[in-house]
């Protein structure tokens, strides 16, 4: 039976929710980012002589990274930070990553290598590195990433300045490969969406996750939550929630830059996003009990938003399918989608310029923003399909349990023959002619579309009409009154969001900001690490003392046998 044959009230209600959720969330992200930038992102240069910089351990988990790991270690070895060690862990790679690491250990004094022939996943590799680390502060980066020279200073400073309660500090990932259509879209996504989200979440007081590609941990904090979860596919999301539930603070430091490679194929991007969504959903299942504890209330907004995101994704796909194939009111649906596309496109353009204000300080990427200012619209569509695809995987993974092992990621098609200065982190990609042509056509079409949107918006606000505008408005079923309605509501919701977040920030500062509930913890001792019952005394001593150590089997106690 046609569910819309009796009345289109259901269509209107569901359609309104589907439209207003991404619209309101985008406005909230913009408001939160502005507040964060004003209070915590003012330009400043670190006085390197002001602090007594503690020694740090830089951890590099590796799996099938033979093409990238040497460059990463070379860059790490030349950092200006006064005292650090590098610990690279090969987690059962099927290529020659282990051999390369052992050779590099002979070349670089700061490098220590753990070569485990059994693949047990990234979290397990981090367990090995944490037991091998000699210092209290751990900086973890991906083995294809390049750490900016000033990044360790910015990360560590967060622990030193009123950071007694800080358990982790997440940095600001930047994209190295930015030539292909897919990599350019991700470049815009990280800056105009992910960057705004992280800033807003910090205003709320909690974050959904650290960035696994660049994050600094306090070892004492990690030990208090039994390190990383080895049975969840996204160990960075999992440990973020564990730390925050133990009342450790997680900070976002956008000045700590790390340059990474991103997927350049549709399948690679799809697999990455499904993995992220699956990990987020596994966290939702695992931490459903936070509503039983009033002390966890600052995590509630993050949790609720994640649940609503899942429900929205399912609703959007179901709504779209039903309205296309069964709805009686196809004309109304056409008008709805036309207006929604226009509204979200205009908001994407505004979001673009706000993100430019924040991100242009760190990376000259304005030309990419103009090129793909329309991407936030597609972000919501892509995310809907990703969330729905990941849902059964996360349910099955939660039921089955076991190690969350990793697969070889898509790092793009990098031109390794390209010569570049040591301070240039971006790289060229090997593109086929077809890919270049497709990217150019998409660029031309979407640029023209965004021009129409902006032109239509300005003319609607000013009440201007001509023959061209009339044709466009008629085709899109939009009137000047619709545009004015949209403009006024955008302003109202932005002001309301700004005020709510501003008051929330003041409350957080007064209620939590100056509390001294936890004195600066002492450095983690050997006895404390052994108390986790993950390695025996002999293995711990080997991990601490050997420059290169090889394990045929996993030295970390198996899942199910801990404590």
Language model regions located:
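A conserved acidic beta->alpha catalytic loop
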Residues: 82, 90-99, 118
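Long helical/loop segments within the catalytic core of UDP-sugar-dependent glycosyltransferases
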Residues: 35, 109-115, 123-125, 129-131, ...
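Cell-envelope/extracellular polymer assembly enzymes that use nucleotide-activated donors
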Residues: 54-57, 85, 238
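Juxtamembrane C-terminal module of membrane proteins
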Residues: 31-55, 289-302, 326-425
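Short, acidic, metal-binding catalytic loop of nucleotide-sugar glycosyltransferases
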Residues: 74-83
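Acidic helix N-cap motif at the loop->helix transition within catalytic regions
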Residues: 70-71, 95-104, 150
């Amino acid at each position: 039976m046609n569910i819309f044959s009796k009345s289109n009230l259901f269509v209107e209600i569901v359609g309104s929710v589907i439209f207003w959720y991404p619209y309101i969330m985008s406005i909230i992200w913009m408001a939160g980012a502005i507040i964060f930038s004003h209070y915590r992102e003012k330009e400043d240069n670190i006085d390197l002589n002001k602090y007594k910089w503690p020694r740090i351990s830089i951890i590099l988990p590796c799996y099938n990274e033979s093409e990238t790991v040497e460059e990463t270690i070379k860059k790490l070895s030349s950092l200006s930070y006064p005292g650090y060690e590098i610990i690279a862990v090969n987690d059962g790679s099927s290529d020659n990553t282990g051999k390369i690491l052992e050779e590099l250990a002979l070349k670089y004094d700061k490098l220590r290598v753990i070569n485990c022939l059994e693949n047990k996943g990234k979290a397990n590799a981090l367990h090995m590195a944490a037991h091998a680390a000699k210092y209290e502060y751990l900086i973890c980066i991906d083995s294809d990433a390049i750490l900016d020279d000033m990044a360790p200073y910015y990360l560590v400073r967060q622990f030193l300045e009123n950071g007694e309660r800080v358990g982790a500090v997440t940095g600001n990932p930047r994209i190295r490969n930015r030539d292909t259509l897919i990599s350019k879209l991700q470049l815009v996504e990280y800056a105009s969406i992910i960057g705004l989200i992280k800033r807003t979440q910090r205003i709320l007081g909690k974050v959904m996750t650290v960035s696994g590609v660049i994050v600094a941990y306090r070892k004492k904090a990690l030990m208090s939550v039994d390190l990383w979860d080895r049975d969840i596919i996204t160990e960075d999301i999992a440990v973020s929630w564990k730390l925050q539930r133990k009342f450790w603070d997680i900070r976002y430091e956008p000045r700590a830059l790390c340059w990474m490679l991103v997927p350049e194929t549709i399948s690679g991007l799809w697999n990455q996003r499904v993995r992220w969504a699956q990990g987020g959903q596994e966290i939702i299942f695992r931490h459903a009990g936070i509503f039983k504890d009033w002390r966890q209330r600052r995590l509630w907004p993050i949790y609720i938003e994640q649940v609503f995101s899942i429900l929205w994704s399912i609703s959007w796909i179901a709504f779209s399918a039903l309205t296309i194939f069964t709805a009686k009111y196809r004309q109304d649906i056409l008008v709805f989608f036309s207006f929604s596309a226009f509204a979200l496109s205009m908001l994407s353009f505004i979001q673009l310029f706000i993100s430019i204000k924040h991100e242009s300080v760190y990376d000259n990427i304005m030309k990419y923003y103009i090129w793909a200012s329309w991407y936030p619209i597609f972000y919501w569509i892509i995310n809907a399909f990703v969330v729905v695809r990941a849902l059964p995987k996360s349910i099955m993974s939660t039921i089955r349990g076991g190690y969350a092992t990793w697969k070889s990621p898509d790092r793009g098609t990098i031109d390794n023959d390209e010569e570049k200065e040591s301070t240039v982190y971006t790289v060229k990609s090997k593109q086929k002619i077809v890919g270049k042509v497709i990217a150019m056509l998409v660029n031309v079409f979407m640029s023209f579309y965004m021009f129409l949107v902006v032109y239509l918006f300005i003319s609607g606000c000013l009440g201007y009409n001509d023959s061209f505008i009339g044709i466009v408005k008629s085709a899109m079923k939009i009137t000047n009154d619709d545009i004015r309605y949209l403009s006024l509501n955008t302003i109202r919701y932005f002001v309301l969001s700004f005020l709510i977040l501003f008051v929330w920030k003041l409350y957080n500062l007064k209620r939590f900001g100056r509390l001294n509930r936890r004195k600066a913890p002492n450095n983690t001792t050997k006895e404390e690490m052994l108390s986790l019952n993950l390695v025996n005394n002999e293995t711990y001593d080997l991990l601490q003392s050997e420059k290169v150590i090889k394990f045929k089997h996993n030295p970390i106690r198996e899942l199910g046998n801990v404590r």
